[in-house]
């Protein structure tokens, strides 16, 4: 049974603020185009999209569309940043290659934010995804039942930074 994640309006606002700050520390800027490719059901992804919007980035709610459709979205909207899981980032890159698309050359993704499973903080895994995509990979960590994204990696990639002002 999935975990329900009830949040107050204040919790949600704090979370959106934290996402915007964390995205900034990971290099996302207002001129970026961000695609969120995780579902919005009981995974609480809404604040991630709203955090990118608060920062000024164009935000695309891609959800869990088929991989071929997501690749088309990445090309059509010239997406520069994507949020997904580490395993799906790898799978999507491999799918692109099978479709004759070189993620490094043909897509223009510069940042991949990963969460939801181990991998993003494992240097070897992160480096393999970065090599496949030609993009920087940043790990995010969260617990749906306390605050969603509780920590994230900055451009130094030397660990995760806690949302200390929101986690008590």
Where in this protein do the model-derived segments appear?
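Short, composition-biased local secondary-structure segments
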Residues: 12-25, 39, 92-103
């Amino acid at each position: 049974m999935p975990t329900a994640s009830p949040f107050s309006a204040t919790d949600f606002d704090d979370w959106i603020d934290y996402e915007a700050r964390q995205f900034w520390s990971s290099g996302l800027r207002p001129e970026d185009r961000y695609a969120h490719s995780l579902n919005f059901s009981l995974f609480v992804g809404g604040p991630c999209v709203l955090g990118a919007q608060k920062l000024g980035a164009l935000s695309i709610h891609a959800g869990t569309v088929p991989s071929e459709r997501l690749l088309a979205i990445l090309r059509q909207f010239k997406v520069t940043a994507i949020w997904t899981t580490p395993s799906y980032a790898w799978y999507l890159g491999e799918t692109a290659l099978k479709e004759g698309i070189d993620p490094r050359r043909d897509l223009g993704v510069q940042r991949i934010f990963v969460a939801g499973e181990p991998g993003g903080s494992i240097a070897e895994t992160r480096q393999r995804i970065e090599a496949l995509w030609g993009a920087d990979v940043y790990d995010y960590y969260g617990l749906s039942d306390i605050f969603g994204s509780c920590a994230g990696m900055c451009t130094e990639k030397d660990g995760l930074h806690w949302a200390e002002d929101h986690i008590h």
